[in-house]
């Protein structure tokens, strides 16, 4: 009843206060609002400029005369997807040495804009980049967020915080800040905050518990969350003891053959409200392409990338035998253990996000999110609705953007996708994003 009344009040307010010429209605269609409740059949969403002003049923909402109508009948209307783990500087090529050796000077001209476009076209309207060259990624964020390059709302970590630099980039490509000590860690987190980073990324199990504790504590003091790339159970325990906290994320959770985490690890994850980021597609993508090379001919891959880069990425799978690649082995060797551990965490009540690591090997931006959602459902036992909520509302919480995005509600930004299908029956329908609206602007 309250919901009905509030919709009505908003609708009446709309008619009197707003100029109908500026209002757009998404009319018909089933609305999944991101909160996890029953969908609204024959839904209507009114947008005024960049904001949503009403969400409800056709019977509840008056559409002012002169309103522009977008017909969404037969389709699913839901919040734009949020991916909390992407990399704008890679496009799914199988060989990082080759990629960075050849293309570091094409990041701004071609690669990052192509990644941004591919994400947005796939219905991903907000992302968190978890590690790239500092100068390029701050530039990219400002270009996209000021509207100069089409792409999702972009939040960034800047560099990986590690004990050693990454091996495959040149000296001039500053994607790593090496941590020397706990004091150094604090200083670097403060420096990143000053520079305007949105999140801190640790990517090294060699960081000591003291160094991690300094990173977590300083980041939390600065109002930043931390995403930690961790595989081994012992390293997860170290990060938990070091104070990884509420809605910080453990990226790549579930890795390795072991079929359960020790009870103390699960308990700390629950007590500290750490969010689980499984990035399953970053493990399974190579298997999918090796077993079905036709995937590299997907027209969406061709559509989103400059022709020569697409050709080079395709060649890296079509003309190289990758069956002895460690990722291919891991895809099958770790699957049973990962599934068992993810289900253990799910049953215990851990918070789950949807996190793709898109751009990594065989994990192109146009496919990452819908594939990860399907794998999440299969491997964790989450319901389709739970996965949809994780990909929208929960991910907005992780990014500290829950007041602006993540659910379809009056007052929030109009980041909305229209899916040609029914993801509550078949999550793979998320592949068929027909329209993408970001901030009230229709991008496709
Ligand atoms: Zn990553």
Model regions and ranges:
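Active-site core of metal-dependent hydrolases
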Residues: 202-334, 353, 360, 396-399, ...
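His/Asp/Glu-enriched, well-ordered alpha-helical/loop segment
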Residues: 319-330, 335-423
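Metal-associated gating/positioning segment near the N- to mid-region
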Residues: 76-143, 210, 231-251
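Positively charged n-region of N-terminal signal peptides that target proteins for export
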Residues: 1-4
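Histidine-rich, glycine-flanked metal-binding segment
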Residues: 22-24, 31, 35-78
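Active-site mouth loops of central-metabolism enzymes
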Residues: 97-110, 169-184
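Divalent metal-dependent hydrolysis catalytic cores, especially in the metallo-beta-lactamase
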Residues: 112-135, 152-159, 193-205, 225, ...
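Bacterial N-terminal signal peptides
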Residues: 6-16
């Amino acid at each position: 009843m309250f919901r009905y009344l509030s919709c009505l009040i908003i609708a009446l307010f709309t008619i009197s206060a707003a100029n109908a010429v500026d209002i757009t209605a998404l009319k018909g269609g089933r609305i999944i609002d991101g909160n996890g409740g029953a969908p609204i059949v024959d839904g209507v969403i009114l947008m005024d400029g960049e904001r949503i002003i009403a969400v409800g049923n056709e019977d509840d909402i008056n559409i002012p005369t002169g309103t522009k109508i977008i017909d969404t009948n037969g389709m699913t209307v839901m919040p734009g997807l949020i991916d909390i783990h992407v990399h704008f500087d890679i496009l799914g090529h199988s060989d990082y040495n080759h990629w960075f050796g050849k293309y570091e000077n094409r990041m701004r001209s071609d690669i990052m804009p192509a990644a941004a476009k591919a994400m947005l076209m796939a219905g991903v309207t907000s992302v968190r980049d978890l590690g790239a060259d500092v100068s390029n990624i701050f530039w990219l964020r400002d270009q996209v967020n000021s509207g100069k390059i089409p792409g999702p709302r972009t939040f960034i970590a800047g560099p990986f915080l590690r004990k050693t630099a990454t091996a495959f980039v040149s000296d001039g490509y500053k994607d790593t800040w090496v941590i020397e000590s706990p004091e150094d860690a604090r200083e670097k987190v403060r420096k990143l905050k000053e520079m305007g980073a949105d999140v801190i990324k640790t990517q090294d199990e060699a960081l000591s518990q003291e160094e991690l504790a300094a990173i977590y504590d300083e980041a939390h003091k600065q109002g930043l969350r931390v995403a930690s790339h961790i595989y081994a159970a012992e390293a997860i325990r170290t990060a938990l003891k070091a104070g990884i906290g509420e809605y910080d994320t453990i990226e790549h959770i579930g890795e390795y053959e072991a079929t359960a985490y020790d009870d103390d690890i699960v308990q700390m994850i629950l007590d500290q409200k750490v969010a689980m980021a499984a990035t399953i597609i970053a493990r399974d993508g190579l298997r999918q392409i090796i077993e079905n090379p036709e995937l590299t001919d997907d027209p969406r891959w061709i559509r989103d990338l400059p022709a020569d880069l697409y050709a080079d990425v395709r060649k890296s799978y079509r003309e190289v035998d990758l069956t002895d690649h460690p990722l291919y082995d891991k895809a099958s060797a770790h699957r049973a253990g990962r599934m068992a551990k993810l289900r253990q965490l799910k049953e215990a009540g851990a918070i789950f996000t949807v996190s793709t690591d898109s751009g990594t090997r065989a994990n192109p931006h146009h496919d990452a999110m819908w594939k990860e959602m399907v794998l999440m459902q299969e491997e964790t036992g989450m319901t389709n609705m739970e996965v949809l909520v994780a990909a929208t509302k929960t991910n907005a919480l992780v990014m500290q953007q829950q007041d602006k995005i993540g659910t379809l509600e009056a007052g929030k930004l109009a980041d909305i996708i229209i899916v040609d299908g029914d993801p509550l029956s078949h999550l793979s329908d998320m592949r068929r994003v027909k329209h993408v609206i970001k901030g009230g602007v229709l991008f496709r």
